[in-house]
Amino acid sequence: MTENYKIIGNFIKDMSSETPDTPTYIFVRDKISKYKLNIDINSKAVKNGIIEVNTILRFSDQPEILKKAHFEITYTSIVKVDEKVSDKKEMEKIILCDVPNKIYPDLERIFLNLLTDSGYPGIKFEKKIDFTELYKQRAN
């Protein structure tokens, strides 16, 4: 099947690593395996069939934990959608499934480097994110 979109660019819109102090760093270093990865995707039309797709990763502990670090990245993809795409469902699939599946390997590498460079080496996300499956679950 021919792709009905083209990613014309990607960039890091925002990136954050917050560890407030040394006691928190020591606490988090021992507990970071309990942190959860959350994903959010949003988009907005720019002009002439160009869409900005923001894929946001957040890696954090439960809200009730006081000593915690927070890691977040917003990775933006500039997407040119084929003018033949007019169906809302098809557009939704491009934004929520196709683009994230294509950019995720780079996004994960950048995010893991952020964690390593923030003093938390060796973190791996055991489960690979299947945006196709998430999209199907959302549709049901």
Swiss-Prot record:
Gene Ontology BP term (one): protein transport
Gene name of the record: secB
Cellular location(s): Cytoplasm
Domain of life: Bacteria
Gene Ontology cellular component terms for the protein in this record: cytoplasm
Pfam name, any one: SecB
Complex formation: Homotetramer, a dimer of dimers. One homotetramer interacts with 1 SecA dimer.
Organism: Pelagibacter ubique (strain HTCC1062)
MF-aspect GO terms: unfolded protein binding
Entry keywords, A to Z: Chaperone, Cytoplasm, Protein transport, Translocation, Transport
Record-given protein name: Putative protein-export protein SecB
Function: One of the proteins required for the normal export of preproteins out of the cell cytoplasm. It is a molecular chaperone that binds to a subset of precursor proteins, maintaining them in a translocation-competent state. It also specifically binds to its receptor SecA.
InterPro entries with a match to the protein in the record: SecB, SecB-like_sf
Family named by the database record: Belongs to the SecB family.
Gene3D superfamilies hit by this protein: SecB-like
Record's keyword annotation contains Transport: yes
